[in-house]
Amino acid sequence: KLSGGGQLNDSGSHLLDIIMWIAGEPVVEVSAFSDHFDTEVDINTAVKMKFQRGGLGTLSVVGDAPRWWEEIMIVGSVGQLLYRNGELTHITSIEGASYQVAFPQTSANPVANFIECIRNPKAVNHTPAVCGLRTIELTEAAWRSAAAGGKVVKVPRTA
């Protein structure tokens, strides 16, 4: 009741935002299933996504897992990147050859940037509002899909 919308909204929204940021494009269609366990909000949700240029993605948000676990896998033409609980690995062959990858150093500090944007109307917002809007559009489309038993739902583009 106090969650603000369930696990997909609370935790999954951050992952959805990251996935769209990594892909560099929005999701256009979604299919989702959720389990509420007799509560008002989703506890576990499985989401299938189709990106604007045809790429596919999946997301599982598990609110009743015995421990925290976070994993993102991106498969491409020259291998895959696996982010697992804070570590990034590049897997380079089907045999599993891999090496740890250092995260790129950035000068961006989202909190400092947010404060600067409040103080200075001419400051550049490095996290534009459209990122949040796309995440909300996708989250709400996933909720509609789950309510319809997993029916494929088009993700609206309001901006």
Language model segments and positions:
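Predominantly a Rossmann-like dinucleotide-binding segment in NAD(P)-dependent oxidoreductases
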Residues: 1-33, 38, 149
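Electropositive phosphate-/nucleotide-binding environments in soluble metabolic enzymes
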Residues: 9, 13, 105-108, 133
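A general structural signal for well-ordered alpha-helical segments in protein cores
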Residues: 15-16, 108-115, 136-139
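Secondary-structure boundary/capping signal
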Residues: 26-27, 31, 55, 122-123
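NAD(P)-dinucleotide binding in Rossmann-like oxidoreductases
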Residues: 34-44, 51-112, 125, 157
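C-terminal helix-rich "cap/oligomerization" subdomain common to oxidoreductases
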Residues: 52, 116-159
